[in-house]
Curated annotation (Swiss-Prot):
The keyword rRNA-binding applies. This is Small ribosomal subunit protein uS17. InterPro entries: NA-bd_OB-fold, Ribosomal_uS17, Ribosomal_uS17_bact/chlr. GO terms for biological process: translation. One of the primary rRNA binding proteins, it binds specifically to the 5'-end of 16S ribosomal RNA. Gene3D superfamilies: Nucleic acid-binding proteins. Part of the 30S ribosomal subunit. One of its GO terms (cellular component) is cytosolic small ribosomal subunit. PANTHER family: 40S RIBOSOMAL PROTEIN S11 FAMILY MEMBER (PTHR10744), SMALL RIBOSOMAL SUBUNIT PROTEIN US17M (PTHR10744:SF1). One of its GO terms (molecular function) is rRNA binding. Belongs to the universal ribosomal protein uS17 family. It comes from the Bacteria. Keywords: Ribonucleoprotein, Ribosomal protein, RNA-binding, rRNA-binding.
Amino acid sequence: MPKRILQGKVVSDKNEQTVTVLVERRFKHPLLHKTVRSSKKYRAHDADNQFKVGDTVRIVECAPISKTKRWTVLTETAEVSA
């Protein structure tokens, strides 16, 4: 089974070797026919404490590291400025 990869924004880096990543997804509501935004927070392992609040990162699923951590930070994605 392939590992899931998600992209989100770091909203907290207060814990040692852990960041909280907010992942937002958009989908069309089947009845209302409008775009709905849904978000979820994931706790991800950051071994080197290199990611800060506001960074856009990619996280990948992994074996459980602790009670709440099931994800590892892969890379930081570059922000595209318009």
